[in-house]
Each structure stands twice: as structure tokens, then as C-alpha cells.
Amino acid sequence: MNELLKSCVNGRTLNEIEAHSIMRDMMTGSLSAAEIGGLLSVLAYRGETAEEITGFVRAMREQAHTIDGPEHVVDTCGTGGDGSSTFNISTAAAIIASSAGAKIAKHGNRSVSSKSGSADVLEYLGVSIQTSPEETIKSIERRNMGFLYAPSYHSSMKHVAGARKDLAFRTVFNLLGPLSNPMKAKRQVIGVYSIEKAKLMARALEAFEPEHVLFVSSRDGLDELSITSPTDVIELKGGKTYEYTVEPGDVGLPLGRLRDIQVATPEESGRLIVDILKNRGPDSAVHIAAFNAGAALYVAEQAADLKEGVALALEAVAGGEALNQLERLKQKEEELYA
């Protein structure tokens, strides 16, 4: 058995160099499925440290196929695994925010621990998910949004896919994915299923010099800014860290209902997103999408604060820009400029 793995089993935490080493071994196929499963189980049981996450992220970024995107590009993504069965809120938020001026590099995958992953729902909506890096950059430059399909950029993840699936519970990879955007986005809105994990991720991300990042974790368990409860926020901006709580009323939104934002399939999620973009979905669904889109607009410097961002997002939905953006994203490049 790997010596570092043995030390983890015996209760010791890893320093950043050791964490980097063992993640590199995982990413290069040097560990067996049993060893990977053992490590992920130990970490899930005892909890990860910020230093371990920093080392893991550094190794994942080194193994990834990275690309350079436009300045101020924003990623909206979450850890998933909150078990709430909500529609793909961060995906809807990305479409709305990009229609209102933010440049979005949406990093995502098919579902691992939820009803529907961002790739699943975008595919249902008719948006191409497996574009080349060049096509993705062009889409962001011309349409303000591109999708970075995780397996295309993190091919080394194939070595851990089997173990993750077999374990069927949240692992450290739920935390690492949002910190490993292939476009090295320095601006992000990251939804996290618990504020404790958000604090860990924020401390780890500080090592990578972020420009403006919001970690959001709602008290009803969503890895989103919520319209059904207060949301705890950790904001990294200009080398400083701010912690605060935001409620729907703070940004001009009423409290909503969880059942109005829950779905059972990617198809149901897709249909609800279309209804939201048409401004005819349940108020709770429109509002939670706008709340999270507003956060992306704030991080993208398109809004002075969250409240202004939400107002701009609601305007984009009401004015039809968000629905038009979906149609643009569905078009092939040659159709768009024919």
C-alpha cells in the first residue's frame, strides 16, 4: 500500500507536498482502485484540511488540459451533492448572467451525485457540450458564454471515476472540481453544500491568487444562494476575505418555496429552465436563478453589488435577453454569422 495512504489510514493529515504527491499518483493511474477508494473513504470520514485541498488542487491543475480565456471570465459552479433535487440553478444563472454582460466559462460535468449535471441539462437544451478549446474561447468572446466539459479537460480523472461511482457518497472531488476550472478563472461563484467546507475551500483557493470569488452555502442545505433561507457567503476580493449572510429580502426578493425548484430528471430541469428564461416559471424558480445570476454579474464587475446584479438579471429575463441568449448558444458558429 502507498506509504502516504498508510499514514492517512493511521490518522495523520498530509502537508501540501504530500497531498500533491498522492493526488498526482491517483491522476496518473499509479494507485489501484482499492487504494483510491480507501483514501477517499478516509478523507470523507475524518475531513480534509485546507493544506490537503491546496495540494490536491495544484496536482489536478497540473494534470488538466488548461486554456487561456478572456480577461474577467467567470465560472458559476457548485460542489453538487446537496441532495436537494433542485434544477440546475448555476446553469440557468450562467445563461442569464451571460445575457446581461458577464463572460462565463461554465465548467461542469454529467451528474455524479445529483439528479442532473450541467452537461446533462445543456445537452437537453440543445447546447453543444463537447466543443474544442478554440470553439469554447470563440463562444465566450462572441456569445459571452462557453462550456468546459470536465472530462475533455481532466482526462486523468478517468483513473478515479470507478472508485467515485462505487462509493456513492460525497468525496473530496466534489470540492476539487469547482477549484480546477481549465480556464483558470480568477472570478467565480462557487456553491458549497456546507459552510465548513466552503471555509476550507476558500482557504485553499487563497494560494492561487483569486481576483473575486464568492463561496455560497445556504442554511437550507443548497449549494446556491437560496430564496428559502439565509445564505452564508465567503467573499475573496483584492486579497481580503469577508464573511457575511445574505437573505432574499436583502436583494429585493421575497421568500420562495423549495418544492417549486425541485425536479426529478435532467429533462424536467431543462423544461423549467426554459420556462424561467421565458419569464413564466414559478416565481421561486425565476428568483433563485436571478439571485445566482446576480452574484455572477457582481463578480464580473457588471454590477456594483449583489442587489444591483439581481435587478439586472431580472431585467434580462423580463426583457427577453436571457431567452435570446439560449437560442444563440444553441446555434452553430456558422449559423450565428451566416
Swiss-Prot record:
Pathway: Amino-acid biosynthesis; L-tryptophan biosynthesis; L-tryptophan from chorismate: step 2/5. SUPFAM superfamilies: Nucleoside phosphorylase/phosphoribosyltransferase catalytic domain, Nucleoside phosphorylase/phosphoribosyltransferase N-terminal domain. Anthranilate 1 binds at residues 78, 109. Mg(2+) 1 binds at residues 90, 224. HAMAP family: TrpD. Belongs to the anthranilate phosphoribosyltransferase family. This is Anthranilate phosphoribosyltransferase. It comes from Bacillus licheniformis (strain ATCC 14580 / DSM 13 / JCM 2505 / CCUG 7422 / NBRC 12200 / NCIMB 9375 / NCTC 10341 / NRRL NRS-1264 / Gibson 46).
